């Protein structure tokens, strides 16, 4: 059986990247929360 996680950097950036997060209100909320939490990396 094939494993479910088949990593691809292009897909990773396109779905979880910083620019994608900035595009929607919800994504911006994600970044805001991660900033408040003090995450070293806000997005992929």
Swiss-Prot record:
GO cellular component: ribonucleoprotein complex; ribosome
Record PROSITE patterns: RIBOSOMAL_L34
Start and end residues of each stretch annotated as Disordered: 25-44
Protein's UniProt keywords contain Transferase: no
Protein's GO biological process: translation
Gene3D superfamilies assigned to the protein according to its UniProt record, in alphabetical order: 1.10.287.3980
InterPro entries per UniProt: Ribosomal_bL34, Ribosomal_bL34_CS
Keyword Aminoacyl-tRNA synthetase: no
HAMAP family per the UniProt record, alphabetical: Ribosomal_bL34
Family statement drawn from the similarity comment of this UniProt entry: Belongs to the bacterial ribosomal protein bL34 family.
Name of this protein: Large ribosomal subunit protein bL34
Organism in which the protein naturally occurs: Caldicellulosiruptor bescii (strain ATCC BAA-1888 / DSM 6725 / KCTC 15123 / Z-1320)
Upper lineage: Bacteria, Bacillati, Bacillota, Bacillota incertae sedis, Caldicellulosiruptorales
């Amino acid at each position: 059986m094939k494993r479910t996680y088949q990593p691809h950097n292009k897909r990773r950036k396109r779905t979880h990247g910083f620019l994608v997060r900035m595009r929607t209100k919800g994504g911006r909320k994600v970044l805001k929360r991660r900033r408040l939490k003090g995450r070293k990396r806000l997005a992929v």
